[in-house]
């Protein structure tokens, strides 16, 4: 079907693998071209709508006119980048949610520095979870949101939910956890 192009491409790849291995076959297992944000990784269009010394909050707007009123706020782990759920267009959870009509917000945890290195768990709850909830509701004009907690982001979110329940704060209407303890 390719008129021999696939065979030639395979020979070129084998030649390049032998070059990388200094005469021995070094089989390339991944695309080694550099990742570029917005080009070949994290391609869902979003914008920062809030920032403080701990987080940046990124808003992704659905492409269509039909959208759900209640936004979705995602708390990924701080050991991953904000785009952990938007690695490739073909299997981006962010894009899938947008295509379903959801307005999506994702917390991007800033790297620890001299300002944040002594922050406690409570600081992460207040400056992370509470700040993101408030900013999401302000950006959308809604009174409630749905949330997702992923890994340690989910553990943090569950701590915040316990405090919110004890104080009568019901702004988070539903929660889903991924790989959280």
Labelled PLM ranges:
Residues 149-153:
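Gly/Ala-rich beta-loop-alpha elbow adjacent to hydrolase catalytic centers
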Residues 157-161:
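Short helix immediately C-terminal to the catalytic nucleophile in hydrolase catalytic domains
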Residues 1-4, 8:
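Extended, charge-enriched "interface" segments that sit outside catalytic cores
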């Amino acid at each position: 079907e390719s008129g021999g192009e696939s065979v030639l491409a395979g020979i070129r790849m084998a030649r390049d693998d032998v070059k990388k291995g200094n005469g021995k076959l070094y089989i390339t297992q991944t695309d080694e071209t550099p990742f570029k944000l917005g080009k070949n990784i994290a391609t869902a269009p979003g914008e920062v709508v809030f920032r403080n010394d701990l987080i940046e909050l990124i808003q992704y707007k659905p492409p269509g006119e039909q959208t759900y009123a209640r936004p979705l706020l995602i708390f990924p782990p701080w050991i991953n980048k904000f785009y952990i759920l938007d690695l490739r267009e073909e299997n981006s959870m962010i894009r899938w949610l947008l295509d379903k009509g959801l307005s999506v917000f994702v917390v991007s945890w800033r790297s620890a520095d001299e300002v944040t290195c002594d922050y406690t768990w409570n600081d992460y709850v207040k400056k992370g979870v509470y700040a993101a909830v408030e900013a999401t509701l302000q950006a959308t004009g809604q009174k409630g949101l749905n949330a997702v907690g992923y890994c340690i982001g989910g553990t943090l979110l569950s701590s915040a939910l316990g405090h919110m329940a004890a104080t009568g704060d019901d702004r988070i209407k539903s929660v889903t956890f991924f790989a959280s303890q």
